[in-house]
């Protein structure tokens, strides 16, 4: 199952719960959520999806990632900025994107092109 959610500012948690409730989880199917705004990840009930893929933050746009340090201007904020995150049994991958938002600047946080290989553990 592939479910997509656009950006929702207010009422994010209620919106996601209603959206996921509209589509019954199919037994023996992987359930992926394409979530524009990674901040909504914390509002997803544990086990509601197998993987959340997100973007929105552009990886923080400014940071020290290019120097080998996992730090961006968003590191201490509530926003998951880039990479893999876990909350209970839920997993989130935030893509850094290739461009920028707002001010035309990207320093120390390179864009990325990702290739993901999903392997389903059939024992679960």
Spans of features found by a protein language model:
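Soluble catalytic domains of enzymes that build or remodel membrane lipids, polysaccharides, and related
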Residues: 1-124
């Amino acid at each position: 199952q592939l479910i997509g959610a656009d950006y929702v500012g207010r009422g994010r948690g209620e919106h996601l719960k209603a959206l996921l409730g509209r589509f019954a989880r199919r037994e023996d199917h992987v359930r992926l959520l394409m979530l524009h705004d990674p901040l909504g990840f914390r509002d997803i009930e544990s086990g509601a999806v197998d993987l959340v893929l997100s973007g929105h933050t552009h990886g923080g746009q400014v940071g020290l990632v290019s120097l080998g340090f996992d730090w961006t201007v968003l590191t201490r904020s509530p926003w998951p900025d880039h990479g893999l995150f876990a909350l209970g049994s839920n997993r989130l991958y935030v893509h850094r994107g290739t461009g920028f938002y707002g001010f035309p600047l990207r320093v120390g946080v390179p864009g990325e092109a990702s290739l993901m290989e999903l392997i389903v553990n059939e024992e679960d």
